[in-house]
Amino acid sequence: NGDQLSPLKKEIEKNGGKCFAYSLDARKEEDVINFINKIETEIGEINVAVYNIGANIRFNILETTSKKYYKVWEMATFGAFLMGREVTRKMIPRKKGTIIFTGATASIRGKEGFAAFSGAKQAKRALAQSMAKELAPKGIHVAHVIVDGAIDTPWVNKLFPEYVKEKKKIDGLMKPDDIAQNYLMIHNQPKNAWTFELDLRPWVETW
């Protein structure tokens, strides 16, 4: 959503950074292909690509319609496949690059009411693992990061104000900048010590 990206873009630029913001439907193959080509043409080589789109919904199995299940899969898994494949096309000739997929605890375990979400997240993890094994010999680092906890974003603050207030008192809410530092660390790792999977969670999170 371009409107939602605008405040973030302004904040980055205000702090002296350089930022470009685009919006697209990550589930549409043609849009993703055009998007990747646009970045490479207008901005430069893609050295790092991060896919963190997903929809966390909770319905029991009988309430989970095929439409709901398919949409969650499209956003979490199919979009990840499209992005991963297209940036791989650009990175292979250069023999370098980092691709990071964001997961959740649902990536490694199922829970009642989360059949669609868990199924899609576990499929994304398998995609990441397959790509990591295939692309490492080509110089491309693929990683999967499990982000387990609420993140301090405008959306979370708006929907769960009391929860956020209590968590912030004990430093129990994940900060986007701190998550980003871990992603940057993965990108900067030497080839002799690459991470495939990393868990990130607040110290108070039950797991």
Regions found by a protein language model. Name each.
Residues 2-3, 23-34, 66:
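The beta1-alpha1 cofactor-binding region of Rossmann-like NAD(H)/NADP(H)-dependent oxidoreductases
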Residues 17-18, 45-46, 91-104, 137-140:
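Active-site loop of short-chain dehydrogenase/reductase
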Residues 52-58:
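Conserved NAD(P)H cofactor-binding loop of Rossmann-fold oxidoreductase domains
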Residues 60-62, 68-70:
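Substrate-binding pocket helix/loop in short-chain dehydrogenase/reductase
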Residues 84-85, 129:
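A short, exposed helix-loop element centered on a Lys and neighboring polar residues
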Residues 98-123, 129, 133-137, 151:
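Catalytic loop of short-chain dehydrogenase/reductase
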Residues 137-149, 162-207:
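C-terminal helical subdomain
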